């Protein structure tokens, strides 16, 4: 039986408070280490070189020297503007377009298909214990190839779940219990935290002898992140496992296990980005004594084939950005196209045609939001922003004549891009998405304008006043609403009236997840500023 919870109960304001509390691969040789730059062939520094005064976030305005074209904003050529001194992108257009891979074409597709069938047989064959099947499923997931075997995995989990007698599992150790708990919860099965009761002593603490079981502790640690409200035992499990894993690192003789522990303490599985995790785990799995060579070779080949697809998508996005021309017309903006593509890749990474379409379009929306945010936060004067916001709120192309030159480019480019997305949604899903897309942009720019007025007027909002705007000005609702239509199709994923109503009124699942994202972003920003 799977967990079924209403959206309202999952994302109520009452539960919000609880919610707040990281190359191509040679298939038969050693893998190259590329934890972040996995879709690029060459080693590049991920850090952007910036000037020493990179962030100018104080109230004092700084004269930002732009090109002559940009200074044709008004007759007055001495407009004083803020400047964030964003560093230029390190991902040049020519470099991105030069990316290539050998892992394309029928030869590799046939080779991958053969290996896939062999792994599929592995998934279906009977094993000595259910735990062995769960370990295989977990390995397949961590290697990043589980999307090939979704039906097989669900079938295995259904069978194991229905055959499990949780009340008579006293002989099952900490590792197996934790793995079962994590996998079942990840796939939506109803599993009670009572399965951990047998590991608790009379004083309500985890039994002391468990501190010596490093493998079990690691499994418990990963399971502890699948927590819901009022499950304090999992919070205690996390604290207990972290404490003893750190202690055990000093005495672990198995280098592979030590690597797994260190990595998990840095990035738990529940927080990890799938493609980055897969790239890292392929290396680790290849060093294990019980490695399955067929599975390993399939994971390597699949990674390389996917990487080739991702490279082509990035090249496509780069051509769109080059043709849009914003980076040349408005050089004060952040060119973060590659980072925006990575964002979309963390959401969905499989090679299906609809997934490729989603990543390409989602990258565009992300970069549009980033650029317009810079107009409000950095470059635009208050008077210009009022005109800019008015154009967005009325969404009338004729209002472009009221805007400065750089805003004309931006407004028309954004309007055309959103209209194109609306057309694609109509073509693929049979729904007129434009009213919903336009509304999200109007609401976003309205919040941007409100915060711009706060800045220029020296107004410090109360916490409630800030939060009422922050969840929207973080732009996550805009990305979510565009994503809803990008994922839609008339056959596989049709648009529903319930869904349209939810995005129109910003259902709690949108609002509160956006709030979490915004507050986490603010916290990370303050932390980065504090370390400079």
Model regions and ranges:
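Terpene synthase/cyclase
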Residues: 2-532
């Amino acid at each position: 039986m799977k967990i079924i919870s209403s959206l309202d109960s999952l994302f109520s304001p009452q539960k919000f408070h609880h919610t707040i509390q990281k190359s191509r691969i040679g298939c038969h040789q050693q893998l190259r280490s590329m934890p972040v730059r996995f879709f690029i062939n060459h080693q590049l520094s991920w850090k952007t070189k910036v000037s020493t005064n990179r962030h100018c976030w104080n109230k004092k305005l700084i004269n930002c020297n732009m090109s002559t074209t940009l200074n044709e904003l008004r007759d007055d050529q001495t407009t004083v503007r803020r400047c964030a001194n964003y560093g230029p992108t390190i991902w040049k257009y020519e470099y991105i377009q030069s990316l290539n891979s050998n892992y394309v074409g029928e030869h590799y597709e046939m080779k991958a298909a053969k290996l896939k069938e062999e792994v599929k047989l592995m998934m279906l064959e009977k094993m000595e214990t259910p735990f062995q099947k769960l370990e295989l499923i977990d390995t397949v997931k961590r290697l990043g190839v589980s999307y090939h075997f979704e039906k097989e995995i669900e079938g295995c989990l259904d069978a194991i779940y229905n055959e499990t007698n949780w009340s008579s599992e006293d002989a099952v150790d900490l590792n197996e219990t934790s793995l079962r708990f994590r996998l079942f919860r990840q796939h939506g099965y109803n599993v009670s935290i009572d399965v951990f009761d047998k590991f608790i002593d009379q004083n309500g603490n985890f039994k002391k002898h468990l501190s010596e079981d490093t493998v079990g502790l690691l499994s418990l640690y990963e399971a502890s992140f699948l927590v819901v409200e009022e499950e304090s035992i999992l919070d205690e499990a996390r604290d207990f496992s972290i404490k003893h894993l750190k202690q055990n690192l000093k005495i672990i003789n198995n280098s592979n296990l030590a690597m797994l522990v260190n990595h998990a303490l840095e990035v738990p599985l529940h927080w990890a980005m799938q493609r980055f995790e897969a790239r890292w785990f392929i290396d680790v799995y290849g060093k294990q004594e019980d490695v399955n060579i067929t599975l390993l070779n399939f994971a390597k080949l699949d990674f390389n084939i996917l990487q080739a697809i991702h490279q082509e998508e990035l090249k496509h996005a780069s051509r769109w950005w080059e043709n849009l021309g914003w980076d040349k017309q408005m050089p004060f903006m952040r060119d973060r196209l590659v980072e925006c593509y990575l964002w979309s890749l963390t959401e969905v990474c499989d090679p299906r045609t609809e997934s490729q379409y989603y990543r390409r379009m989602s990258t565009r929306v992300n970069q549009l939001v980033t650029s317009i945010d810079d107009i409000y936060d950095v470059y635009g004067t208050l008077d210009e922003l009022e005109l800019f916001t008015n154009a967005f709120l009325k969404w009338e192309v004729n209002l472009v004549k009221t805007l400065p030159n750089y805003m004309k480019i931006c407004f028309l480019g954004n309007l055309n891009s959103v209209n194109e997305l609306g057309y694609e949604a109509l073509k693929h899903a049979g729904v007129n998405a434009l009213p919903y897309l336009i509304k999200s942009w109007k609401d976003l720019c309205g919040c941007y304008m409100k915060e711009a007025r706060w800045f220029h007027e020296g107004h410090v909002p109360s916490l409630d006043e800030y939060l009422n705007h922050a969840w929207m000005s973080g732009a996550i609702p805009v990305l979510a609403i565009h994503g809803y239509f990008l994922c839609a199709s008339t056959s596989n994923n049709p648009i529903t009236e319930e869904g349209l109503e939810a995005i129109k009124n910003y259902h709690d699942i949108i609002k509160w997840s956006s709030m979490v994202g915004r507050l986490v972003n603010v916290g990370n920003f303050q932390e980065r500023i504090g370390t400079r």
